[in-house]
Amino acid sequence: MAEIKIAAIKRSGAFSPNHIGNDTAILNIVAEQLRKRGCEVNIYSEDELIAGKVSERIIVNMCREHRSLEILQKKEDDGCLVINSGYGIENCTRERMTRILVGSNIPYPESLIVSTNEAVRDRLVSAGYTRCWIKRGDYHTMHREDVSHVRHPEEAQEVLQEYFMRGIKRA
């Protein structure tokens, strides 16, 4: 019987656009390598984590669901070893990562972070933006429409409105 029991939690398919197979393969390879070293590894979905089915004190994960991150953070606070910390994953959401990098003077493309339901045309014009990229602020790309190149401030406003209608609050 293995002395070390590890939970390996798969990333939800919604957060693996065009890469579901790749992400699953990565986690399976990690699990297999741990098993070769004598560990017992149980693979779970994010839904199973959220449902409370994970009891192991060591967790390797690829989670991205907001609720999953909250659970991972709680487990980490309670003394579990969480590889891919829920706190670290949360810091990799686009808006938070942008703020951290810019605030730490790490070179990063000039950025404006806005609410998708606000009028931004005048702000873009005064900042000198003409062509630019608009990216969802909450997560990295989940659909190809989550990253949009626009040619002028009016088009930027239209794209932000589309994001708002899709439930994306920040870009």
Where are these regions (language model features)?
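Conserved N-proximal alpha/beta basic substrate-recognition cap immediately N-terminal to
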Residues: 10-113
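A short, charged/proline- and glycine-enriched loop
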Residues: 1-6, 54-56
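Active-site nucleotide/adenylate-binding loops and adjacent lid/helix of ATP-dependent enzymes
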Residues: 2, 8-10, 79, 87-170
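Short, charged N-terminal helix-start/capping segments
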Residues: 43-44, 169-171
